[in-house]
Amino acid sequence: MRPTVLAAALAVALSTTVFSAQAQAQDTNSELAELKAQLAALQAKVVELEERTDAQSDVNVDTAGQLDKLNTGTTKVDTKGGIKVTSADGKFEAQVGGRIHFDAYAFDRDLVDTTGTTEFRRARLTLSGKAFGWDYKMEQDFSAGTNLDGLRDLFIAKSAFGGKVTIGHFKPYRSMEELTSSNEILMMERPFASATGLFSGRQFQQGVGYLRAGENYTAGFTAFNMRGASSSRTEGVGAAGRVTFAPINTDNSTLHFGGWASHENLNKGSGNISASANYAGRRGPSQTIATVTGDSGDTSNAFGLEAAGSFGPLFFQGEFANATFEQPLLADQDIQTWYLQGSWLLNGGHKAYKSGTGVFASPKVADKGLWELTARYDHIENKDVQDREASSWILGMNYYVNANMRVMFNYTKGENEFTGDETGQYAVRTQFAF
C-alpha cells in the first residue's frame, strides 16, 4: 500500500515540476518576443528621426543659401554720417553729405571801421560716389551763391598708374593747411600760406591732377587753367606739385615733413592775382601784400616747406612759403609767409594722420566729447615794399561734441605794419557736417 502511495506522490510532484518549467519557458519566450517588438519599434523611430533631421538640415542649408542670395542681391542703404546707397555688387555708390558752418563775430575796433554780425560761413551740399570704375564728386556752397560762384569740387577720378587721376574743378596740390578739409582745420580760418592769403581767390582751379600715396608718403601733381568756375575764359595756365613723407607714423605718433611748389603764368584773358591778408579774422580789415596784373602776362612762382606732428594729445604744424610776383616795369617782389600752430586735447584724444593725402584729421570723439586748446602765430611780408606786412595771434578752444558736430571759439589780435591798425576779433562757430 505504502509503495503505491509513494509512487503516486512522486508522479504528481514530477508532473507539477515539468508543467511549471514549461510554463516558465513559455513566459520567458513571451517576454523576449515583447522586448524584440519594442526594440524594433524604437529602431523604426530612430530611423524616422534621422530622416527628419537630414531633411531639416537640407532645409537649413537651402534657407541659408537663399538668404545669401538675398543679401548679395539687395541694394544697401547706410544712414550713418550721411546717406549712402551701394549696389548689390558694390560697383556703384551714391552718397549725399554736407556741412553747415554758422559764425558769429564781434570786433575790437582800432583804426578800421568793421561790422560784427552773424553769417553762414559754409552751407554745402555734396553728392559723391562711383560708377563704372570712376569716382565722382559734385559740391555746391550755397553761402557763396547758387550759381558758379558757389561751385566747389566738381570732378571725376579714376585709379590708374598706381595712384589716382582727377579731372575737373578741384584744389591744386599745394599748401598743407589748404588741403585740409574745412571741417578739420584747427582754427576757424586758414593761415596766410593758403588761398586765404598767398593764393587769394585761387582755391579751386580747372585742370587735371595725379596723386599717389602709400602708408607714409604722398606725391601729387596738378596742371590747371587760371580760370575758376565763375571767372572769365583765359589762356593763363599753372602747375603745382606736392610731396610728403612721414618717418614716424603709428596709431599714437606721427611726424610729417612736406614740400610743394606752384607756378602760375598769366596770359590772354587772365585776371589780376594777388596775395592779401585778412589779419583780424574773416570780414575784418584786409591788406594787399602784392599783385600781378593779368594783362602783363607775368608769372608768380612759389614754394613751401611743411613740418607737423601729432604725439598723443599734443599737435603742432607749421609752414614756410616764399613767392615771387613778377612786375611788368619794376623789380620782382618776393613774398614770405610762415605760421606755427598747435593744440592740446585736454581730456584725451589724438589727431590722426591721413596718409592718403598727407594731412591731419580731427580727433575721434568719445561719448563725453573732447576739449582742444589751440594757438597760432601767422605772418606775411613783402620783402621789397617797406612796411607791407601783417601778422596775427590767435587763441582758441574747440569742443568736439560728437563725430559730426564741433563748436569753435577764436580770439584774433591782428597787426598791420603799413597802416598801424591793431583790430581784434571774437568769433564763435557752430559746425555740423555729415
Residue ranges and their predicted role:
Residues L111-V112, A261, S270-F434:
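Outer-membrane beta-barrel pore domains
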